[in-house]
Curated annotation (Swiss-Prot):
Cystine pairs: none
Molecular function GO terms recorded: oxidoreductase activity
Listed cofactors: FMN
Top EC class, one word: oxidoreductase
Protein name: Putative NADH dehydrogenase/NAD(P)H nitroreductase Atu2496
Alphabetical list of Pfam families matching this protein: Nitroreductase
The species this protein was found in: Agrobacterium fabrum (strain C58 / ATCC 33970)
Domain of life: Bacteria
InterPro entries recorded: Nitroreductase, Nitroreductase-like, Nitroreductase_HadB/RutE, RutE-like
Alphabetically ordered keywords of this record: Flavoprotein, FMN, NAD, NADP, Oxidoreductase
EC number: 1.-.-.-
Amino acid sequence: MTKSLDDAALATLFTEARTHNGWTDKPIGDETLMALYDLTKMGPTSANCSPARFVFVRSQEAKEKLKPALSSGNLEKTMAAPVTVIAAIDSEFYEKLPELFPHADARSWFTSSPAVAEETAFRNATLQAGYLILAARALGLDTGAMSGFDKGKVDAAFFAGTTWKSNFLINLGYGDPSKLFGRLPRLGFEDACVLA
């Protein structure tokens, strides 16, 4: 890959993209959610481990299950979003490695070291959720990621008896630009980077 994206694509993904707090009532169809995952899954992970799992919360019943776990500042915008993604982590992601990394016994790397498995799962699932945000923008969707929620309540409501645990939430839909805040500053290169 030697060709750079044009300015319009970079604007869609980064420079003009915003974290949204308000939403239009335009729905998101199943085919769009499937296309979103199909892009997300192509992002690289360590040993192709792919530990992220995603729950697309969209029915009223599922929203009501999620509601008690939300912080007050995230309640209204989350209930209004067409979809809220629970970006989760499968702690036993390594059970899929014979399929995902068949040329080596990668499963044993993680079953022999729970600490390495936990660290790998968290790092790579978070990375995959970042890919999902960029994939959503590439498909014309807006996002609003949040960590203001009660993980224990989400896990009890959605993941009881499973190896999945919540990481963070991402509201998904078509943003209402009138609800945007002014863009906040970002650190300059000299504050965040070192050339070594």
